[in-house]
Amino acid sequence: MDCFHYPLDTETLLRKKRKLRRELLARNPHPLHKKIAILGGSTTNEVADQLGLFLLQYGIEAEFYQSEYAQYWQDAMFGTPELDDFHPDVIYIHTNWRNLTPLPTTADSEAAIDAMLDEQYAHFETMWQALEQKFACPVIQNNFDRPNFRLMGNRDIWDPHGRSNFISRLNQKFYAYAASHEHFYINDIDYLSADYGLTAWGDAFFWHMYKYAICLDAIPSLANSVANIIKSLYGRNKKALVLDLDNTLWGGIVGDDGVDGLAIGPEVPEGQVYAEFQSYCKALKSIGVILAVDSKNDEANALAGLNHPDGVLRPDDFVAIKANWDPKDLNLKAIASELNLGADSFVFADDNPAERAIVAAQVPGVAVPALDGAENYIKTLDHGGYFEVTALSKEDLKKTELYHQNAERAKAQAAFADYGQYLDSLEMTAAIKGFEPLYIQRIAQLTNKSNQFNLTTLRCSEDDIRAMAGDKNDLCLCGKLVDKFGDNGIVTVVEGRQQGDALDLTLWLMSCRVLKRGMEDAMMDTVVAEAAARGVKTIVGHYYPTAKNAMVREFYAQYDFAKTAEDADGNTEWTLDVAAYTPKHPHMKIER
C-alpha cells in the first residue's frame, strides 16, 4: 500500500478509503483498539476518516467521537453525555487560526494586544486543564497555522499588530505548556502548512463551502501527523534504520571506485549531499534509533568506506554490519534475530529499487521508503514519521551503547560450553525496586514500547503508573539489570492488584535485550516472596495474545502455574499456589 508512504497518494487515500480500510483490517486481524475524541473548530468528518486509515496502517483500530461543528470548547468545558460515556484514550483538538477571535487590528494598543493574547491563551489552557482533570488521557492540540495573506506584508511578522506576529507569540505559549505538562502534545500544523504550501493549505474555498479548516488534499498529511503522535504513544514506532552503503551513505561503489573515489564530504556538491545524510542518520542515533548496515560488499571495503576521513558515520555507530554477498532480506532477518526485534521494528533504506522490492516482499512488516535521489533521502525518511518522539529517556540516549554491550556478551558466551557458567561470568546484579519517581517515565515508556515479552500489553501513561504506585493494594515492581559489561537500565515491569488473599497480575513485561539472562526468574522469585509477605495465597496471571507476543504464551507454565481458563480468542488465565512455589535462584545477585 504505497499510498501511505511519502509522498502520500492523496487521491487514492481520499477516494478509496473504504477499500483501504477493508484491506488493512484483513491484513491485521488483531489490531490495538483505541478511542479517539476529536474536538473540532471546523468540520472534522474527513479528518476522522483519514486518521482512522493511518492508525490502521500502524495496527491501531480507532473508534471516534466527533464534536459538533466548532463546539470543541463547549464539549471540553461543559461536557456531553456522549463524550462522557465514550471514555476517550486520546483527545485531539483540531483548531486553526480561524478559531482565534478576536485578532489584533492596527487600532489596538500594544497593552490591549497583550491582554488579547493572554485571553486567547487562557481560553485554551482552561480547556486543557478541564480535559486533564476529567479524562486523564493524552491530549493532542494543533498549534496555529497562519492566514495565507499578510495585511502588512513583511511587517506582519514583527509588528505586534500583525496577525502573523500574534499567532507566533500564541504558539510559543502553547509550546511552553507542552514542555511543562506530561501527556500534552503539539501537532505542528504551522510546519505542515509551510511544508504543504500555505497558499494551497489555506484555500478559502474549502472553508466557505464546507467549513474545512484546510484544503481537502492536505487532510491526509494532517491525519498522518496526528497518527504519528498516537502510534508513538502506543509503542508502534520503528526502532532501527538499516542502511545500504553504495550510493546510499556515499556516492559511488567502494569496491570499484576505491575509498578515494567516493563522493562524501565538502569537496563536491554530491559529496555534501551524502555527508548531510550521514549527519541526519547520526542525529537519529542520538534520539535512540539504532543503525545497522545491510550491503552487498566485501566487509573490508565496507569498513574502509565507513572510515573515510570526510565521513560522519563510523563503524561503531552501527549495532550490526552485514557486508557480504548474501541476499539483503536474509541479512535483515539475521539482524532482527541478533537484536531480538521484530521485522516491523525496521526501516530499510536502499537506493536500489530492485533490492527494496525484494526486502519488502520477503520481510513483511519492514518499512521500505522509496529513496529517489540522494538530495531527497532526508526528506523521505523524515516525512515517513517512522521515529516520532513523544518521550525521550536516558535509555534512549544510550541505545547503541546498550546493543554494543549485548554484542560483547554474545562474544563472551562463545567461550563457555556451560550456559550457567556463562551467566555466572557476567557478574549480574538485579536491582528490583518499586515504582519510584526516578523510574516512572521509563516504566511508562516500556509499557508502550514492549510488544514481544508482554503478557497483557496493558499500555500506561505516567499518571497511570503513579496511580498504581500510590495504591496500597498494588504490588509494583521494576527491575534494573547490571553486569560487568554495563548497565541495561530498567528492563522489566510487573504490577498486580491484591484482593484479599489473591494477587491478580495485570502487567508483566520485559525488554527483549535481556532475554535468557534469568531476569524473569529474579522477578518471579521476588513477586512470590512479596506476595507471601502480604498474606497472599494465590497468584493469578493472564496472557492476552497479540500478533507479537506468542513467545510468552506458556510463560506461566514454566513457573508451575496451572491454566484455569481459556476463551475462544486464546486469552488464558493461570493460578499459582504461593506455598507450593519453588524459587528459581537465578545466576545473579538480587538487591531490593
Name what the model sees in each region.
Residues 1-242, 249-250, 255-261, 354, ...:
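Extracellular glycan-modifying ectodomains
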Residues 3-22, 193-240, 374, 378-429, ...:
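Flexible inter-domain linker/hinge segments
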Residues 254-279, 364-371:
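Basic, amphipathic juxtamembrane/active-site segments
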Residues 272, 276-307, 321, 359, ...:
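Substrate-recognition element of Asp-dependent hydrolases with the DxDx(T/V) motif
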Residues 338, 360, 364-426, 529-592:
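Terminal substrate-recognition subdomain of acyl/acetyltransferases
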Residues 431-511:
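A conserved beta-strand-loop-helix scaffold within acyl/acetyltransferase catalytic domains
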Residues 484, 490-565:
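Acyl-donor binding region in acyl/amide transferases
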